[in-house]
A protein has these predicted regions:
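Conserved RNA-binding domains used in RNP assembly and mRNA/RNA metabolism
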Residues: 2-81
Length: 81
């Protein structure tokens, strides 16, 4: 389960609409702009990213790492439990 501190980094990425690279539990990497948090149809908490002009929901439970794709004062790489 993601800690409150880790969740804060998700919210910061969305607030500033940072370009990010997500590494999923499957090993897949997704790149996009963090735009919001939401729940999917299964009610799982997700981060909404914009990739190739398409919004996509990624369940937070599937994320093992989030890397900022641009320099910022808040974070570079965050690893999730």
């Amino acid at each position: 389960m993601m800690s409150c501190e880790q969740h804060d980094y998700i919210e910061i990425a969305c607030l500033y609409r940072y370009p990010i690279i997500l590494t999923l539990t499957s090993g897949q990497e997704l790149s996009g702009i963090a735009i919001d948090t939401a729940r999917n149809e299964d009610k799982a908490e997700c981060i909404k990213i914009l990739a190739d002009n398409t919004a996509r929901l990624v369940p937070l439970a599937h994320i093992v790492r989030m890397k900022a794709a641009s320099d910022n004062p808040h974070f570079d790489t965050v690893t999730f439990d």
